[in-house]
Amino acid sequence: MFATKILRNAQSIKNELPHREVVKMAYDLHKPRSTAIRNLNENHEEPILFMHGIFGSKKSYVQDSKLISSATHTPVYTIDLRNHGESAHAQPFDYATLAADVKEFCDSHKLDKVKLVGYSLGAKVSMLTALQYPELVKSAVIIDNAPIPQPQIQLFMKQYIKAMKTVLNEANISADDKDWKNKASAAMKRFLPNGVIRKNLLANLVNKPPKDFDSPVIDFGDGQIHFLNPIEQMEEMAVEDVTDWPTELTKDLVFEGPVKFIRGLKSPFITDEGYEAIQKHFPNNEFHDLNSSHDILDQRPTEYVKIINDFFNIHRYESAPDSTILGHKDHPQTQARRSHL
């Protein structure tokens, strides 16, 4: 059994992800429990799109999304980015491609004035979507990330990958093992002592795939447990692409709509360089700092949800200003308005 598993893992490394310019992303739609808006449906003119972080999914913050939907009287789409959750496994995985997937989602669902919420990986996807496709975006909440390359976080990505590959390649946990999730957590612990991080990564570990879900590189019928992400194929993409940013592509792009940045004061993600880039690309910004690490959604769940609700409710009836393409020297900097909690 163990030798067979090693062979399968060696074979899976050779399998390349298919190349797809865009994929149709899996999603869940959360509607308000009660609303004054009649006939609220999937085509409501200003829905919220909630995008998860690396190795997250549309299932990561379901209750938070429901709370946001009801508090803002707005439908919330939680989406699976490619290579996550129930969305297709495909390359490439650069930010321009991920933003193109978001545009395809908006086009296919006839959404033309969306409000974006993005955390970590999803934050960068949200920022690039707003910069490249400003006609689609009214406003955004960006949770603890900045529009710059961040090689300093590659170490975190490598640790995540090591821990997940240990489960797949060394732990030898069968799908019918009743204690499979606890054993997987124990295998990951030496690389990831933080239990919250392990819990979030393990949310993508399954002993059977979702109904009607298939992967070109994962054999879900081999009797073993698997992550829903193509981990072997994503190793380089997670380390290189996720920590990168298309600087040349965005050097002259500015989004003029309102953007709230939620920053963790103990997080390394928004540096001074990142703060300057935010002022350049998103002049109509405001900051809200939380006493948190990068894991804001787990450490300060009530606070971040309230910040999102307040921001979207305040800007609900504003018309989005025209977004333009400007050089950095051609537009005034707007001093970020900071609030602390």
From Swiss-Prot:
It comes from the Eukaryota. Pfam families: Abhydrolase_1. Its EC number is 2.3.1.-. Residues 47-301 form the AB hydrolase-1 domain. Keywords: Hydrolase, Transferase. The active site is at residues 120, 144, 294. SUPFAM superfamilies: alpha/beta-Hydrolases. GO terms for cellular component: mitochondrion. Transmembrane segments: none annotated. The keyword Translocase does not apply. It is an enzyme of class 2 (transferase). The keyword Transferase applies. GO terms for molecular function: carboxylic ester hydrolase activity; transferase activity. Belongs to the AB hydrolase superfamily. Probable alcohol acetyltransferase that uses acetyl-CoA to synthesize acetate esters from various alcohols. Not involved in the synthesis of ethyl acetate. PANTHER family: PROTEIN ABHD11. This is Probable alcohol acetyltransferase. It comes from Wickerhamomyces ciferrii (strain ATCC 14091 / BCRC 22168 / CBS 111 / JCM 3599 / NBRC 0793 / NRRL Y-1031 F-60-10).
